[in-house]
Amino acid sequence: MPFVVMITGIPGVGKSTITRLALKRTAINFRLVNFGDLMFEEAVKQGLVKHRDEMRKLDPMVQKQLQLRAAQRIVEIARDEPVLLDTHATIRTPMGYLLGFPKEVIETIRPNFIVIIEATPSEILGRRLRDLKRDRDVETEEQIQRHQDLNRAAAISYAMHSDALIKIIENHEDKGLEEAVNELVQVLNLAVREYD
């Protein structure tokens, strides 16, 4: 049976770092799939964008078509090996927040778990300011908190349409990265029984 763990969190929360470290410690090998990469590859093929950060500025209907194509690819991969799906639950666009997974997309993927990585708005803002490699929109702490609140609401909606369990992992500066990584490893190790 396919085993898919979605891992989400807003930009700057530390999601990619936690994911990379957790995958080194799991009892079974996961295929790390970045949902945005799958969408970006398709958008480049269609000549819609040249840079990944342009994706959120695409027309919402175009984004939804790209999402459905990516979901179909995830299902194909998960038939053979467990998937850790690195993604965003919601995407901030100039017109408002776009759900990362409309109903038909989440029903296609049907993840087993939805893991949300969170931190305080001030921690996220500080991390974003230190990461100059990415072209990110500037947000206030209030906007960052709103985005995290919307991610929780989106995760509940996704769970309703996929029967997934929701796990919230906090990645605070004082808590330590190690604890957040260990929490994710515990979730990922549940896949062992599915691929024995």
UniProtKB/Swiss-Prot annotation:
Family matches, as SUPFAM superfamilies: P-loop containing nucleoside triphosphate hydrolases
Molecular-function GO term, any one: adenylate kinase activity
Catalytic activity: AMP + ATP = 2 ADP
Localisation: Cytoplasm
Enzyme Commission number: 2.7.4.3
InterPro entries: Adenylate_kinase_AdkA (IPR023477), P-loop_NTPase (IPR027417)
Residues binding ATP, per UniProt: 9-17
Domain of life from the UniProt record: Archaea
Alphabetically ordered keywords of this record: ATP-binding, Cytoplasm, Kinase, Nucleotide-binding, Transferase
A cellular component annotation (GO) from this entry: cytoplasm
Main localisation: cytoplasm
Root EC class: transferase
Family classification: Belongs to the archaeal adenylate kinase family.
Protein name: Adenylate kinase
Lineage, broadest ranks: Archaea, Methanobacteriati, Methanobacteriota, Thermococci, Thermococcales
